[in-house]
Amino acid sequence: PKHAYLAATSGMDFIVKIGRLNNLSFSGTKEDGWYIPEAKQAMQAQTLAYAGKYNAPDVEQMLAGDCDLAIESTMILHNPEVKEQLETCGIPVIVEHSSYETDPLGRLEWVKFYGALFDAEDAAEQLFASETAKTADVLNEAPTGKTVAFFYVTTNGGVNVRKSGDYVSKMIELAGGTCITFDDSDEENALSTMTIQMETFYEQAKDADYIIYNSTIDSELTSVSELL
């Protein structure tokens, strides 16, 4: 594809890293929704245009810009009529499932998918090899015993945390830590996060060795006092 539409946000970093950002013409995310500098810069330079969210794409704009592929996340499966509309208009749709990967290295390996898609397989293989090499020493080390709370506070005051089977929790484990979780590890649920009351979070996280605030979802914090 030379003029793709990207609604699967998790793919942007891979696309940038393999040098294929110029193959994207349309974004399903607005400029202020990107935390990847290259994506923001492309939208500022108007080489990447916002063409509506995944569930309400501007098909006319995409057709006028010769869109030749829509890269969707599994969210599009909740709106099959949108996928059908794009395909009826001659825009192929591919649904990537990287969000279903619970293993951090499994998620990383999706760079090979994008390498194959954008004819950059060598770059993708090199990136995967170099990044996995960085983890080799860490994976051979014994667990540190340190506990980690990974979260953000929602607009209504709840606390969003990762579930025990989520890739972020597993990434913390791979790094030698123990992610504080609040769910039943045997629970069958496709969601990777859950929202709990602040009191519940505080009770279990107050003695954590480290707290990591997920500012990619919410606005950044500059001090601990902002949590109070």
What name fits each language-model region?
Residues 1-65, 69-76:
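A short, structured surface patch at a secondary-structure boundary
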Residues 2, 12-16, 60-64, 84, ...:
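Solvent-exposed, polar/charged alpha-helical surfaces in well-ordered, non-transmembrane soluble domains
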Residues 7-8, 17, 52-56, 75-79, ...:
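Solvent-exposed, acidic/flexible segments
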